[in-house]
Amino acid sequence: MRLKIKNLLYQNYLILLAIILVGLFLRTYQLRERFLYSHDQDLAGWFIKDVVIDKHLRLVGQETSTQGIFIGPFFYYLQIPFYLFSHMDPIGGTYLVTFLGILTMVSIYFVFSQIFDKKVGLIGAFIYAVSFYTVNNDREVVPTMPVILWSVWFLYGLNLLLKNEQKKAFLVFGILGGLIWHINFALILALVLIPVTLYLSGKKLEYKNLTSGLIAIFITSLPLLLFEVRHGFQQTKAVFYSLTTPQSDTVFTGYEKFQRVWYLMSKNIHGLFMGTFPWLSFESVSIIFLAILIFLIVKKIIDRRLLFLVVIWILIYIFFFSSYSKIVSEYYLNGVTIIWILTFSVFIWQLLKRSDIKHFGVMILSFFFVFNLNKFFSYDINASGYVQRKDIVSEIKRNSNDRGYPCVSVSYITDPGYNLGYRYFFWLLNVKTAPIGNDVPVYTIVFPLKPIFVTDVNKGAIGLIYPNHESYAKERIEKGCSGENSNLTDPLFGFTR
C-alpha cells in the first residue's frame, strides 16, 4: 500500500515537473523579442537605479493612473537582484516574472490539491502553464503581474478558515492584506469574503488568532504607513476622493457600465481558455462557465460553503466595477481569474474520474492545449518593445560617438505618451542629453513609421532620423553640452525623486 502511494506521488511530481517545463518554455521563448517594454518598465529601471546607484531607499513605486495614489515598492525591490545579475539591464525584470509564473503553477497545484485532489491540482497547474492569457500575464513586468498568485493563496486562506484553522488563516490574510497596496488595489474587494467565511465556518473568532496576522500586515504595510505619516496621509485622501468623486468614465454609465464589466469578464474567460478556437463568442464562453458552476452546485461536487464564497467573490467584482466611476480595464478583473481556473479544473476532474466519459475530458484538455499553443506561436510580436527601443538608443550612441558629440538632444514624432519608455536606456548606455534648442544635434525618434517621415535607420516599427550634421558647429555643440545631463534632471512622468 505504501509503495503504491509512493508511486502515485512520484507520478504526480513527474507530471508536475513536465507541466512546469512546458510553462517555463512558453514564458522564456523569444524572451527579449516578446518583452513588452514601455513607460512602466522604464520607470521600474529608474526606481532600481535610484535604490542601487543613488542609495536612496524608496517607500513608494510609480504613481498610478489615479492622481496622488502610488503603487507599493515591493515588486520593484524584488527586481533588484535580477537587475544586478543582468548588469542593470531591464531584461532582469523578465527573470523575476518568469520565476513568479513558475511559483504560481506550483502554488495552484498545492492549493487545489489541499482543497480537492492532486489531480485537480495538476489540471489547474496545466491550465495556468499553457493558457495564452496567463503566459502573456507572466511576461509583463508590472506590479499587477502577481495578482493570480495572490488570489490562489487567498483561496487557500479561505479554505483554512472553513476548516477552523484560524491562526494559520489569519497569518495568510495578514501577509496578503499588506501586499494589496504593492500589487493591485482592486484585491481589497476580496477581503469582504473573510468575515463571510468566518460565519460559514460556524466558529466564533478567537482574537488571539489575529496576532500573527496583525504583525504580518503591519510589516508588509510599513512602507505605506511611513509614507502616509511623512506626507500627511496623501494617499488615504486620494483614495477617498477617487471613490467619492466621478472621474474619467463618461462613456459608460448605469446599465451600460454593467454590460461593459460583463463583456470584459467574458473576454478574460475567453482569453484564458479558448486560444484560437474560432466558434464561440466572449459572452458564449462566460455562459458556459456559469452553466458549469450551476452543474457543480446541483451535483454538490464542491463544498456548498466554498461554492457560495466563489459566487460572492465574482459578484463583488461585477457590482463594484459596475458602479465605479473610473474606466475599467481587463486587468482590474484578474482578481477572479483563479475562480475560472478552479471551476474548469474541477469540471475536467469530474469527467476524467468516470471511465465512460473520460475521453471527453482528455479531448477538451487536448483542444485547450492545441488552440492555446497555436495562438502563442501565431501571435504577432510587438515590434516596438525592448529590443527595438534599446537598439534605437544604441544607434544614437554609436552615431553620436562616431561624430564626436559630447551629448545629444532627442525629439519624437509620435502620439502623446509614446515618447515615453526610452530614458532609462539613455542612462544605461551612458548617453548624455541636453534640451532641444541648445545648439546640440537633434536625433528624432519616429513611431509608428509613416511614408511622410523619411528615416535613416529603422528598428522594427521604430525609426530614427539623424541630425543634419553639417549645421552644427563644434564650439557651439560643446557649449550646449556643458550643462547638466537633462536625462537625469528633467522630470519623469509618474516618478518622484
Predicted regions and their residues:
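Hydrophobic/aromatic-rich transmembrane helices and adjacent perimembrane loops
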Residues: D138, L307-K353
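Catalytic lumenal/periplasmic loop and adjoining terminal transmembrane helix
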Residues: G361, S366-C481, S486
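Transmembrane-helix motifs of polytopic, lipid-linked glycan transferases
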Residues: Y95-I115, W153-G157, I292-K299
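Transmembrane-lumen/periplasm boundary regions of multi-pass, lipid-linked membrane glycan transferases
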Residues: E33, G45-D54, T64-S65, L161, ...
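Membrane-interface transmembrane helices that cradle and orient dolichyl/undecaprenyl
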Residues: I115-F116, F154-F170, I180, Y199
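Signature aromatic-anchored transmembrane alpha helix within multi-pass, membrane-resident enzymes
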Residues: L17-I20, I215, I348-K375, G385
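Short helix- or helix-capping micro-motifs
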Residues: G23-L26, G124-A129, G177, W181, ...
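Short acidic/glycine- and proline-prone juxtamembrane loop motifs at membrane-interface regions
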Residues: Y133-P146
